[in-house]
Amino acid sequence: MAWRGWAQRGWGCGQAWAASVGGRSCEELTAALTPPRLLGRRFNFFIQQKCGFRKAPRKVEPRRSDTGTSGEAYKRSALIPPVEETVFYPSPYPIRSLIKPLFFTVGFTGCAFGSAAIWQYESLKSRVQSYFDGIKADWLDSIRPQKEGDFRKEINKWWNNLSDGQRTVTGIIAANVLVFCLWRVPSLQRTMIRYFTSNPASKVLCSPMLLSTFSHFSLFHMAANMYVLWSFSSSIVNILGQEQFMAVYLSAGVISNFVSYVGKVATGRYGPSLGASGAIMTVLAAVCTKIPEGRLAIIFLPMFTFTAGNALKAIIAMDTAGMILGWKFFDHAAHLGGALFGIWYVTYGHELIWKNREPLVKIWHEIRTNGPKKGGGSK
């Protein structure tokens, strides 16, 4: 669930200001100068007020080093990213702001699937060598004294008992936990807002489309997303395979953020978003499309079960209604974009993209076998 950022901030005043405006009280001056606050879930932009009096010259204050803001600036709910220190201004040409994200989405998706195809080739090649290495290792283990109660042995046992899907998403979960910890560092707040929240009104448009997929400010938000990803990990990896799943997941994060950009530009509701929900919606939609008769249940209400197909229809209907009615708590455009991409990929995309990877794999095989061609003239 990609969260919208919001903040509210007022202006203070001093005795010198009250004297310069004809004896108006500090409270009256504050009310007159206070810009529109950022209310609700929508990130509204500050509008500069025009005043009918001359303002006293401002004292030049020494520039503070960017070592973070005061603790008061971030005393807020754990669900709300501290965005009051960063103001985003919408482009006067909003459609143009989508050109770079569009090219980035297409280019990144192509690179993701190309890298996954090469990764699969290398994995298959290494399995043959690993097979013989495994035989040798088993023989050495049989004659080597075994350590009982060794912590490393217990970790290896736990890891070996995981499914391929669970092993794959363990790395994704670790990355999300790392980014969550970075949000807790005050000196990194500006960097996190700039690069780990996606917003078409920001100066940085492309890299946040990927990085925000691993970004969660709320512990509950991250825990809920990672639980859903863990629950569907075995099914999706059994359907797609490890390498193809990673390409789909990363591409889904970028594609869902691009759909979010389009929705924000179309409605004018700008605001930073973050979270893995767009990519997770792709995983959920792909599994529910492939296994529509599978039974699902809610974590705290296991007595109520429903089919995967019905669950997918309900989620799409809710996100569509959220977009039309302007619900602001979730980024419904990102959710809907991720779900539609998941449905499209398992229905058509696998045939169009993954099964046509052979030319790229052959080129890579020739490079690995013969090495790069040497230039120059004849010997």
Curated annotation (Swiss-Prot):
Ranges that cross the membrane: 102-121, 168-187, 208-230, 245-262, 274-292, 296-318, 333-354
One Gene Ontology MF term: serine-type endopeptidase activity
Modification type Phosphoserine: residues: 65, 70
Top-level taxon of origin: Eukaryota
Mitochondrial matrix-side segments: 53-101, 188-207, 263-273, 319-332
One protein family per Pfam: Rhomboid
Location within or outside the cell: Mitochondrion inner membrane
Record membrane topology: Multi-pass membrane protein
Key words, A-Z: Hydrolase, Membrane, Mitochondrion, Mitochondrion inner membrane, Nucleus, Phosphoprotein, Protease, Serine protease, Transit peptide, Transmembrane, Transmembrane helix
Alphabetized Gene3D superfamilies for the sequence: Rhomboid-like
Matching PANTHER family: PRESENILIN-ASSOCIATED RHOMBOID-LIKE PROTEIN, MITOCHONDRIAL, RHOMBOID PROTEASE
Name of the protein: Presenilin-associated rhomboid-like protein, mitochondrial
